[in-house]
Each structure stands twice: as structure tokens, then as C-alpha cells.
Regions:
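Conserved C-terminal beta-signal and adjacent last beta-strands/turns
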Residues: 8-12, 21, 231-233, 298, ...
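Extracytoplasmic beta-strand/coil segments of soluble accessory domains associated
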Residues: 77, 81-118, 139
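Short acidic/polar hinge/loop motifs at secondary-structure boundaries
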Residues: 118-145, 163-164
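Transmembrane beta-barrel wall of Gram-negative outer-membrane proteins
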Residues: 181-211, 216-254, 281-304, 348, ...
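Face-selective signature of the C-terminal outer-membrane beta-barrel domain
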Residues: 233-247, 284-421, 432-434, 490-496, ...
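Surface-exposed extracellular loop regions of Gram-negative outer-membrane beta-barrel proteins
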Residues: 256-264, 417-423, 431, 435-478, ...
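Outer-membrane beta-barrel signature, preferentially recognizing the C-terminal barrel domain
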Residues: 265-298, 386-388, 432, 436-438, ...
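Gram-negative outer-membrane beta-barrel transporters
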Residues: 400-406, 497-500, 519-620, 698-700
Length: 701
């Protein structure tokens, strides 16, 4: 790929420039330890144990509570969008739209999202919807880029996002109540309280309610969420925490925006679509709950432990009607996960650490569905159930022979009841030529297991699962340089990455014309990430991030799709395999934040984001059954956001935020729409949300 020569040379040049900067600014650092604050930040997710940022071989992003407050973001997706290597993707930004985090050009199922170290992604989809996680409950987010399969198994191919929730503080009571209202009849009320109530025992409780009508017809959201964390903290000897959360939400599924001029369409007095939404009757709902019990400690200098037990219950309801005759489908998909994992970390001598761990998960999957007749009544019922379990053992060894060098190596063996086993090695190296410089190199194998939907989807006339799927496998390599200068008032990071995936799982028509998942081909990418944070100077802080991704996919290009008339006339599908630019992956992304923070409680943050163009491929009929592949382009776009926050009398917080201030129009995904009055099928988009404003007031005790 073209980036391998051109951009790797640019990366090396940037490394030399940043390295030289150490000497230029060394005198201003005065050798002070304060200059290494950023690289001294502690990260848990990268190695499952607390490590300083300068000691881990991965590129990381760390976002704390102050960053969240200053951002004005109302969701995790808004918060992380366009950070280095991060692409936030939705189907239109409406109330209940699925929100995925894509890292370094990989799909959403290649990012493992954790809450307190436990995967919260949907097992049946293999993707985590971060829109279901309340931002009020977050203390800190750690994003570790690069292969995470060594420690976290399937799905951690591009990276891991670990969301750490709030916990009580000693000698301090936390209490906050707030309410806000904004565009599209959106409101949010929330409350939280935490403290130690008896010696070493404490709690932290959050609860909230969100409603919005959305920016299009049938894009509403109604959501209730709550969480509770109980802790028994005896410091290093033992720390026991019991965490639980629950979310109950209902939301509309508006589909694409039909072409201009589309008229209202009715069947039997029910309106099925209009010019704003292709689906006015479709809706979904989620009832998700998680419970995590964690026991950890480091009773002696040379030994630590961390044990978890967890249970997840996720129920998703979908109701869908078809505009061509009014029939439809309604189903409930239930995922239950019971698991345990743990590790011990041993420090045999100075500079050395050995981590030994294991994990077990049991997945129960159930899909209960009903066909709907033309009036929307339930008719034929189908029920499918499956069980999958995984068990694994992993080890990781680290050694730092001097302050200038650290090496890491690890290995994981995982057994999956559906497809067998995988062996996953990882190697890392950290070079610290100076106290405020870290050169990081890591190379690891990753994999993605097929989901229960892929394996066991009910067999029907148009779709069915494939129990013979293999996992996706590949390797991820990255080289990162991090440099802190001017007493941490200047922080720079630059990363070069390369990854590849074989046996990509994709749904395609089989020899009988039935769509089924297959291990199709491969895809890969090279890229460059650059980020800097400057300040505060004169109460101003500037943060910039840029990501270049050159991603390539191998896929089918069909020249003929003849569904025949089985069993009399067999189907005939003809295609060739081609390599092309990866779909829905922008080459260029940029984010700039400028924050002003006064000494009288005022904080103002202006954010600009740029997303480059994205390509989409569709198979279209020329003269049946002949077809061709048509390439569509979703245009690049800029958005601008502004957040103003004023703290009054120490306890009151007034906030006003504006998203997409200039009301920029842009599209997020593409599919087709068929007008039932003309039978014309044309491309149609999922539009992004326009300008919105949200004002809130909160009181902190």
C-alpha cells in the first residue's frame, strides 16, 4: 500500500523532530519531575495492572472527569469522536441510533468496550452500542490501541475502550442533582450520590431519565438508567466492589430519509412512510443489566491479585413492518453471559513482573420471533436457542533492566466451543531515552469469533446462519512516540500502525441465493496518528488530533445475480474478487479543541471536527439478471461545537452547549428506498443531525 513508504518516512522524520525538541526545551524543564506528569499517568487497561503511561508499549488515550465536563458531550460517542485513531459511527444520530466506536479503520466489532473491565458488547451482534452507557456515571475512560486479544480475547483487534465508573471518596460526600432541556424537546434529569458510610464501606449511586423527540419523525428516545457501586476498601490488603447497572429504553427506527418529493404512504389507514422517514412504524427497545463482583489487592510487595465474577442479561426487542404489503417481523433476542476471570501478578525481583490469568464465559442466546400479517398481527412463531462457552489461559512477562528499556511478551490460549482454539502471542518494547520520552513498539495477533447471529440465525427463505464459520484472525503492529515538555504544558504523540485480517466474516448470497455469513476474504490498513496538547498558557489550552487511514478490503463484485426458480431453475451468481478502498472508512479525520478556563469559574470549549469522504459500494441490476458494482461517495464535512460552563457560589453549575452550530448537512450511511407508488428504487441516506442546543443546571454538594 502507498502509505508504507511515504507515510512511514514521514513518521520517522517526525520522530527525529520530536526527539530533537527534547534538547531544545530541556533547559526550560530544569530537570523537574513535574515535566513528566503526562507520562506518569497510571493506566490499568493495557496490562490489567496499574502501569505508568511511559511503561506500556501501546498508544493510549486517557479522558478523565474534568475532560468530560469541559467537552459538553452528552454521549460517549460525542466525547470520543475524532480523537486520534477514533471514528464514531452512527446510523443518523437520532435518539436511539446505534453508536459504534471504530479504531484505526476497523469495524465496530473489532473494538472491545468494557465497563469496569467487563465486556458490555452485545454477544449476538459482536458490537457495543456506547449510546447505552450513561456519561454521568463515568470517572475515567482508558483507550488502548493495538491488539488486545492477549488479555481480552475475541473482538479486541483494533483496541480496547475501558470505562471506569465513579466510586466513593474517603472523607468526602459526593452529591449532584441536575436537569437540562434543549432542541427537539430533549430533556435529561439525573442525580448521583456517593460516600463512605461506615469505616471502609461506601457506595456510589446514579440515576437518570432521558427523553427526546429526535430531529426526524419516529426518531424518539425514552430512557431510564441507574447504577450502584458498593465498595469495601481496605487499601492494599483487599478491595471488594459490587457494581450493577440497568437501562430500559424504547426508541423509534426511522430508517433512511426518502428522496425529496416523497409523499405520505398508507396501508389500511396506517402511515408507513413520509418525506422525513422511510419507516414510521418500526421501533426497538433494550433492557440491559450487568452485575460485577471484583476482589483485588496487593497484600505484599511481590504479589497482587484481581478476581472478577460477572453476569449480563440483555434483551433487545425489534418491531418491523414492510411497506410493500404491510406484513412484518417482530422478535426478541436475549443474551445471557455468566463469566469469571482473574489474574495474579508476581514481582520476583526488581524490574520484573509476571502475570498469570484465566477466563471463562458461558453465553446463552435465544431468538424468539413472529411473522406479522398485513395488519401487523403475530402469526407464525419461531424460536432458536444456542449456547457457547469459552475458556482461556494467558500469561504476560515484563522486564525493565534499566530506566531506558523495558520488554514485554505474552501468550494466550483460548478454546471456543463453536470453532476450536486460538493461540495469541504479543510482543512489546518501550525505550525511554529521556525521562519525558517514550518510544513504544508492539506486535500482536488478534482474532474475532463469529457471533451467535452469524452461527445460528434462523433458516428462512432469504437468510440463515452458518455453523461452520471460522474466526477472523490477523496481526496488529504499531510504533508510537510520546514526548512531554515544558512541565507538561506541551505533550506530543505520533503513531504509525499496520494491521491485517484474514477470513473476514460477511453476509453474502450462497449458491441458492440465500444470504448467509461466510469467511470471505481479507482486509488491511496502514495509518498515521498525530496529536498534541498545548497549555494552559494565559488560561488557554489547545488540543489537536489528526488521523490518516489507508484501509483496503477484498470483496466480491457481482456481474450476475440470477435467483432462478428452485428447484426447477438453479440460481446463478457470478462475481470476481477485487481489492478496493474500504467502505465507510474516511482517509482523513481531524479534531481541534480550544478551552478557556478562568479563575472565576468560567470554562469555554470550542471544538471543530473534520471527517473525510467515505465510499460505499452497492450491487445494482443493469438488465436482469446482469449486475454491476456502483461506487457512491459520502461527502466530507466539518462541524463546530461550543460549550460554556459557569460555576457559581462553589455549588451551582450552569451549562450551555451547541452541537453542529452551523447546521452542516452530512450523511452517515447509505442504502436504498423503494417508493411503493412508483416502484422506483433509489439510493437514500441516513442523515446526520443538524444544529442542536442544550442548557442545563446542576447543584453539587
Amino acid at each position: 500500500m502507498k502509505i508504507k513508504s511515504k507515510w512511514f518516512v514521514i513518521f520517522i522524520a517526525a520522530v527525529l523532530i520530536i526527539g530533537t525538541a527534547h534538547y531544545v526545551f530541556a533547559a526550560q524543564n530544569d530537570g523537574s519531575q513535574e515535566s513528566a506528569i503526562t507520562l506518569e499517568e497510571v493506566v490499568v487497561t493495557a496490562t490489567k495492572t496499574p502501569e505508568k503511561r511511559k511503561d506500556i508499549p501501546n498508544a493510549v488515550i486517557i479522558i478523565d472527569k474534568k475532560d468530560i465536563q469541559a467537552s459538553g458531550a452528552k454521549s460517549i460517542g460525542e466525547l470520543l469522536a475524532n480523537e486520534t485513531g477514533i471514528d464514531w459511527q452512527t446510523y443518523g444520530n437520532y435518539g436511539g441510533a446505534n453508536q459504534e466506536i471504530h479504531i484505526r479503520g476497523m469495524r465496530g466489532n473489532a473494538t472491545q468496550v468494557l465497563v469496569n473491565g467487563v465486556n458490555v458488547g452485545s454477544p449476538s451482534l459482536g458490537i457495543a452500542d456506547v449510546g447505552k452507557i450513561s456519561i454521568d456515571n463515568i470517572e475515567r475512560i482508558e483507550i488502548v490501541k493495538g491488539s488486545g486479544s492477549l488479555l481480552y480475547g475475541s473482538g479486541a483487534m483494533a483496541g480496547t475502550v475501558n470505562i471506569i465508573t465513579k466510586r466513593p471518596k474517603r472523607d468526602k460526600m459526593d452529591m449532584k442533582v441536575g436537569a437540562g432541556y434543549g432542541s427537539q424537546n430533549t430533556y435529561r434529569v439525573a442525580a448521583e450520590n456517593g460516600m463512605f458510610v461506615a469505616g471502609n464501606f461506601g457506595y456510589y449511586l446514579t440515576a437518570g431519565r432521558t427523553e427526546t423527540d429526535g430531529f426526524r419523525d419516529n426518531s424518539y428516545l425514552r430512557q431510564n438508567d441507574a447504577s450502584l457501586k458498593l465498595v469495601l476498601d481496605k487499601k492494599d490488603i483487599i478491595d471488594i466492589s459490587l457494581y450493577g447497572d440497568y437501562i430500559n429504553r424504547k426508541y423509534g427506527m426511522p430508517g433512511v430519509k426518502p428522496p425529496s418529493g416523497t409523499r405520505d404512504y398508507y396501508i389500511g389507514g396506517e402511515k408507513f412512510y413520509n418525506s422525513e422517514a422511510a419507516a414510521l412504524l418500526d421501533h426497538s427497545g433494550d433492557k440491559d443489566g450487568h452485575v460485577v463482583l471484583e476482589v483485588k489487592g496487593k497484600p505484599v510487595k511481590w504479589f497482587g491479585y484481581d478476581l472478577k465474577g460477572h453476569y449480563t442479561n440483555m434483551e433487545n426487542h425489534n418491531y418491523e413492518r414492510y411497506a410493500y404489503n404491510g406484513s412484518g417481523y417482530e422478535n426478541w433476542v436475549t443474551n445471557q453471559v455468566l463469566g469469571t476471570d482473574g489474574h495474579v501478578d508476581i514481582y520476583p525481583f526488581e524490574g520484573a513482573k509476571l502475570l498469570l490469568g484465566g477466563e471463562y464465559k458461558n453465553f446463552d442466546w435465544k431468538n424468539e420471533g413472529f411473522d406479522l400479517d398485513t395488519t401487523g398481527k403475530q402469526t407464525v412463531k419461531t424460536t432458536n436457542e444456542a449456547q457457547i462457552f469459552t475458556k482461556s489461559a494467558f500469561t504476560e512477562a515484563e522486564y525493565r533492566p534499566s530506566q531506558y528499556l523495558k520488554a514485554l511478551a505474552g501468550f494466550r490460549h483460548e478454546n471456543n466451543s463453536a470453532f476450536g482454539s486460538q493461540n495469541l502471542p504479543l510482543f512489546g518494547l518501550v525505550i525511554n531515552p529521556f525521562e519525558t520520552t517514550a518510544l513504544k513498539i508492539n506486535h500482536g495477533k488478534h482474532f474475532l469469533a463469529p457471533t451467535p447471529n452469524d452461527l445460528y440465525w434462523p433458516a428462512g427463505p432469504y437468510t440463515r446462519g452458518n455453523a461452520d464459520l471460522k474466526p477472523e484472525i490477523g496481526w496488529h503492529t504499531d510504533v508510537t512516540l510520546e514526548q512531554s515538555l515544558l512541565n507538561d504544558k506541551l505533550f506530543m504523540t505520533i503513531s504509525y500502525f499496520h494491521w491485517n485480517v484474514d477470513d473476514k466474516i460477511q453476509w453474502e448470497p450462497d449458491s441458492q441465493g440465500v444470504f448467509t455469513p461466510i469467511n470471505l476474504a481479507s482486509y488491511k490498513a496502514d495509518g498515521l496518528e498525530v496529536g498534541t496538547r498545548i497549555g494552559p498558557f494565559y488560561d488557554l489550552t489547545l488540543a489537536l488530533s489528526y488521523t490518516y487511514t489507508d484501509a483496503e478490503e477484498e470483496n466480491r463484485e457481482y456481474t450476475r445475480q440470477d435467483y432462478g426458480w428452485p428447484p426447477f431453475i438453479p440460481p446463478d451468481f457470478q462475481y470476481s474478487m477485487v481489492k478496493r478502498r474500504a467502505s465507510y472508512t474516511p482517509d482523513n479525520q481531524f479534531k481541534g479543541d480550544l478551552t478557556y478556563k478562568s479563575n472565576f469559574g468560567l470554562t469555554v470549549t470550542a471544538t471543530a471536527r473534520y471527517v473525510g469522504d467515505r465510499v460505499v459500494y452497492r450491487t445494482e441490476t443493469t438488465t436482469y439478471p446482469d449486475t454491476k458494482t456502483v461506487t457512491y461517495t459520502l461527502n466530507s464535512y466539518w462541524t463546530a461545537d461550543l460549550k460554556v460552563q459557569q460555576r457559581l457560589y462553589k455549588h451551582w453549575i450552569l451549562s450551555l452547549s451547541g452541537i453542529n452550530l452551523f447546521d452542516k448537512e452530512y450523511d452517515t450511511h447509505l442504502t436504498t428506498f423503494t417508493d411503493q407508488t412508483t416502484w422506483k428504487t433509489s439510493p437514500a441516506m441516513y442523515p446526520g443531525a443538524g444544529r442542536s442546543v442544550f442548557a442545563s443546571v446542576a447543584y453539587e454538594f
